[in-house]
Amino acid sequence: MGVVALPALAGCGSSDQPHAEIPTRYQIPIPVCTTPLPPVARKAGGRAVVRNLDPEQWMGVVAPTFNPRGGLGPTDTDCTGHYLFANESLRGGISTKGWPRPFDPEELDLRAGPEGMRVLWLRVLKFENGDVGGPVALVRAVDDRAEVYGIGSFRGPAKSKVSPVRIGNENIAVAESTICPDLDDCRKRADFYLARRGRLIDSAQVDLERTAVVPSVTERGLYAKYTLRTDVTYKPNGIQLLEQVQVKIIHYDVGERDSDRDLRMVEFSRFLRVERDTLFSSNDPLWERVVGQD
């Protein structure tokens, strides 16, 4: 476990740091990096004090060599020694402000989860298709320290969000993005990241919503529309998925053909179970088994 100092925090008084409290009995993963913070007094009951840091402070936790005045460099490293921007998912990304890139706190997306867990997503790279991307980290600031549990990267549409979620003893990051190249071909997807050996590993992808219009195989000359909805429930031992696919013949102005009607609704439940570095699915996605079959 690496321990790095954060000089920028040394002068911050504890009274200026908003905080909450959590019970110490929660099982928290072992951090790969720890940064000392100015101490705060614990209150009665042995409850850990969750700290709220500003964007510059969080950047100093994830990337110890970060200097707000100097900006971000293309070869900057994180607290584990890996390059921040050298990831296959970020290939082709461009810093439109050049390098070194001035740090803009608005580009650091911060989302909170249970027990003080947070996910940071630094959205500084742009791609030809309109996506944005950059490093992502699962972190927590508690009592007299800030901890990093995993660092990776994510690329997705500008309105994507990456949030921390707890399943049993696992703290994971969940990235949700909506991709709609066409109104008849639209999908909302979730990527589930496990923290392993200091890295955030994309361990499963699930369609939360999806639509597709394809030629009907039972009604020649007409088109079938498939609509998927997935309910996600986080369990102590994994993720429960309830998938529903509605199939209907869409309206088509041709003669007196019977269009614009529901055909059927298909429902199926499957489970994503944590197995080492992946989330193992108990079955194939319902979408792959239904689309094109009417």
Regions found by a protein language model. Give the residues of each.
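C-terminal motif of bacterial Sec signal peptides marking the signal peptidase cleavage site
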Residues: 9-11
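Short, solvent-exposed coil/turn segments at beta-strand boundaries
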Residues: 113-117, 142-143, 165-172, 197-198, ...
